[in-house]
C-alpha cells in the first residue's frame, strides 16, 4: 500500500544486507526515486549515482501559490507528508502524486487549493502541509 511504503522502507533499511538490497533494486528495475518522488538514499554505495538534482527546478506548493504560479507538475512529497498514512491516502485519492499535472490556487484562509488535471474534485491543503509538496513549473 502506497501509504505505508515509507514506514516499511525505514524498517527494512536497518535489517537488510547489501546483497538483498542489490537484488531488490534489480527486481524493481533499478529505480532511482521512491514512490513519493524522492531519491532513494544510498544508491551511490551500491554502484548507482547520487541524485542531487531532485531539488532543481522545484518549488513548494505554498511558495508556488504565493508567487502566482497557477500550474505545475507534482514532483515530490517530502518526509513530513510521507509519515502520515491518512494524509497520503487523501492525497492519492485526489490524484496528488508525483507526475500529476496540477492547477494551483491560493485560498484566503492560508490554504492552497490543488486540482489535478482530469480529476473532478480538488483538495484544499493547509500551508503547513502544502509546504512539503513540491511542483515543477
For each predicted feature, which ranges?
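Amphipathic alpha-helical segments within well-ordered protein domains
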Residues: 6-10
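Amphipathic alpha-helical interface segments
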Residues: 127-137
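Mid-protein regulatory/catalytic core that forms ligand/cofactor-binding pockets
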Residues: 11-129
Amino acid at each position: 500500500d502506497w501509504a505505508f511504503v515509507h514506514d516499511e522502507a525505514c524498517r527494512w533499511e536497518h535489517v537488510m544486507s547489501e546483497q538483498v538490497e542489490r537484488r531488490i533494486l534489480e527486481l524493481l528495475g533499478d529505480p532511482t526515486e521512491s514512490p513519493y518522488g524522492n531519491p532513494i538514499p544510498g544508491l551511490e554505495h551500491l554502484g548507482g549515482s547520487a541524485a542531487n538534482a531532485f531539488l532543481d527546478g522545484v518549488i513548494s506548493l505554498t511558495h508556488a501559490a504565493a508567487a502566482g504560479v497557477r500550474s505545475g507538475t507534482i514532483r515530490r512529497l517530502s518526509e513530513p507528508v510521507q509519515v502520515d498514512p491518512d494524509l497520503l491516502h487523501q492525497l492519492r485519492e485526489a490524484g496528488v502524486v508525483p507526475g500529476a499535472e496540477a492547477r494551483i490556487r491560493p485560498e484566503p484562509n492560508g490554504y492552497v487549493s490543488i486540482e489535478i488535471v482530469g480529476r473532478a474534485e480538488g483538495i484544499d491543503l493547509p500551508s503547513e502541509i502544502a509546504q512539503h509538496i513540491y511542483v515543477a513549473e
